[in-house]
Amino acid sequence: FFLLAIAAPSVVSCTGSAIGVGALSGLAAYEERSIKTIARDTKIAILLHSALLNKSKKHFMQIGIEVFEGRVLLTGGVESAQMRADAVGTAWKVENVTAVLNEMAIGLNSLVDTARDAFITAQLTSKITLDKEIMAINYSIETVAGTVYLIGIAQNTVELEKVIAHARTLSYVRKIISHVRIKEIE
């Protein structure tokens, strides 16, 4: 767990992973995942980033990684089908991975597209965070080439529909793909 405390802030593309360990326990009251699951997801992200970096710096720089409940969402543009297959294979080799959601496209994004995508993600994150009817902490967002990818846990279908509605209001959003699951009623 000490390794996670040191390494978690260095994982830039994993929104949930960038939270420090101290903040982790405070946020756990709002987060649908347990602290153990958050730590496991963080570890998966760190190990996958490391494996991709060791394999190729291109892999590391071009592939976005989000991990939620052991489900790994891979996004970004890669140069070839082989590069995409290698990334998926690498993800499956990481311990505790339960699913790999391959949303990588063949073809690289321009610097303008990358900046625009980051802006879309920031805008959507802000909108859902400020919406009192959405538990934003339970969502991770990636945007690639104008496509918004969502992963996480919605409290109900109404909440998920609100998140998607917020995404639809943003300029340059071409498509929204949801890998969000609806919370099970206990």
Task: List PLM regions with ranges.
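Sec-dependent bacterial lipoprotein signal peptides
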Residues: 1-16
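N-terminal targeting leaders
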Residues: 12-186
